[in-house]
């Protein structure tokens, strides 16, 4: 399925057009001229592709099921940063024919309501760019600043493209639920992948085995992070707290509980963090 792109800057020369065709760009004649187009990648997704997606979980198993389902469709791959290009999505120029193309169009409607951007890699097809990927993409282009969030998408795309042309190293792309969700550094000291299903399964196993009693309270997920909260009871907790209170001349008469919150992210919005309270 093809979509036009909004082209900023000078129009490509004939020689540049031939090179772009080899890279996957398409030039379609329309009334009054022609449009530069890209074929969209039919990225696998479930029902959680919306950039403003969020979900709460009442059961611990639901968190694990969600993470496994998302990870099953997700992919990671590396691209030289200087080969990345960003464009504002234009019009769909073909009617979707397959189920995958119809889903791709639904995802594109959401993209146009949020980032409005496409990401061209060294592949011939373009990916839709999730809003969560913009901060890491700006990092690959080595630019930052509050003003970037205020400019029009086509202008932001051109700024990014000019900077990406001189970018160094490789980028590690996280593709999930219909879109690119992050553009990490793939360098030696860059982003380290810790699959979220493993992080939260290890947390569940540890908490269940380490404490006398644990109760899952709630979980939460959106396109930037996942969190889960447990309440715990343990005699060691009571002993330590009791000793502290005795130093201040007080006694602990009630049953003590504490909460553990685990948060993590695969788009660099958070590390793998543990909070006690």
What are these regions (language model features)?
Residues 1, 191-277:
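Intrinsic disorder/low-complexity polar-acidic segments
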Residues 2-202, 210:
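Feature for intrinsically disordered/low-complexity regulatory segments and propeptides
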